Curated annotation (Swiss-Prot):
Role, per record: Implicated in endonuclease cleavage of capped RNA primers. Displays an elongation factor activity in viral RNA synthesis. Dispensable for viral transcription, but not replication.
Assembly, per entry: Influenza RNA polymerase is composed of three subunits: PB1, PB2 and PA.
InterPro entries: PA/PA-X (IPR001009)
Recorded superkingdom: Viruses
UniProt keyword annotations, A-Z: Phosphoprotein
This protein's name: Polymerase acidic protein
GO molecular function, one term: RNA binding
GO biological process: viral RNA genome replication
Post-translational modification note: Phosphorylated on serines and threonines by host kinases, including human casein kinase II.
Family: Belongs to the influenza viruses PA family.
Length: 75
């Protein structure tokens, strides 16, 4: 399975003991993801949804959100 889409480059070198443990857990998690195809698809979905969410937040000025609370109120 191709897991090259998992980008972990922004995380720098470990400078504290707790970060070393976090790195071990992160490496274990990414190795688990790489050999489980279902998890890989889920993570791809999360990755794509995050990108879409970021794009929609960036374009928020172009859209006007309609408040739904007025429709839920009982008179």
């Amino acid at each position: 399975t191709d897991s090259s889409w998992i980008e972990l480059d922004e995380i720098g070198e470990d400078v504290a003991p707790i970060e070393h443990i976090a790195s071990m857990r992160r490496n274990y998690f990414t190795s688990e993801v790489s050999h489980c195809r279902a998890t890989e698809y889920i993570m791809k979905g999360v990755y794509i949804n995050t990108a879409l969410l970021n794009a929609s937040c960036a374009a928020m000025d172009d859209f006007q959100l309609i408040p739904m609370i007025s429709k839920c109120r009982t008179k």
